[in-house]
């Protein structure tokens, strides 16, 4: 019996610079946590997954969160099936930017593509050094309940948390993302992706 071809899906990860996007993808695809921060311009990975008995080839697109790459980033949205919108648990500003920047960009470029809100660096809530740093900056970690409310308000499929450092929740994020991507038909996606190719 011939093996059927895997279903191909494209996942794009967006969010502020240094919020943990590249680490998340590295841990999921390569199995290691990068120890040095190097700003991403564009990185692509491919992962073969099995979800609900279906073989899925997931193309993973990492994007730059920094402002200097804003003219390039829209290209990465073309033909996306699912978007992960990331923020760092230790950066309330990065969650604020989800509502004020990232969702606006997604709704403009890919209005029909589902997205999941992902709180990254969840391990820092119990890290003594991080706790002290947040106290020194007079800031609080983002609470799960806060992020849940944001997810509901912006129309995210769901809210999830993970830690790339410990690996907690990483596989769950990609399993949920793959499931959501499988609900998108390519014909719908092609209509919305025409907007994704416009560069001004």
From Swiss-Prot:
Record-listed GTP binding positions: 15-22, 62-66, 120-123
Transmembrane segments: none
Signal peptide: none
Subcellular location, record wording: Cell membrane
Any GO molecular function: GTPase activity
InterPro entries: P-loop_NTPase, Small_GTP-bd, Small_GTPase, Small_GTPase_Rho
Parts forming coiled coils: none
Record keywords, A-Z: Cell membrane, GTP-binding, Lipoprotein, Membrane, Methylation, Nucleotide-binding, Prenylation
Positions where lipid (S-geranylgeranyl cysteine) attaches: 197
PROSITE patterns, alphabetized: RHO
Positions carrying Cysteine methyl ester: 197
Superkingdom of origin: Eukaryota
Protein's membrane topology: Lipid-anchor
Residue ranges annotated as propeptide in the record: 198-200
Pfam family, one: Ras
Placement of sequence motif Effector region: 37-45
One GO term (biological process): signal transduction
SUPFAM superfamilies, per the entry: P-loop containing nucleoside triphosphate hydrolases
GO cellular component: cell division site; cytosol; new growing cell tip; nucleus; old growing cell tip; plasma membrane
Subunit-structure text: Interacts with pck2.
NCBIfam families recorded: small_GTP (TIGR00231)
Family: Belongs to the small GTPase superfamily. Rho family.
Stated role: Involved in cell morphogenesis, the maintenance of growth direction, control of polarity and of cell wall integrity. Regulates the synthesis of alpha-D-glucan through activation of pck2.
Record protein name field: GTP-binding protein rho2
Gene it is expressed from: rho2
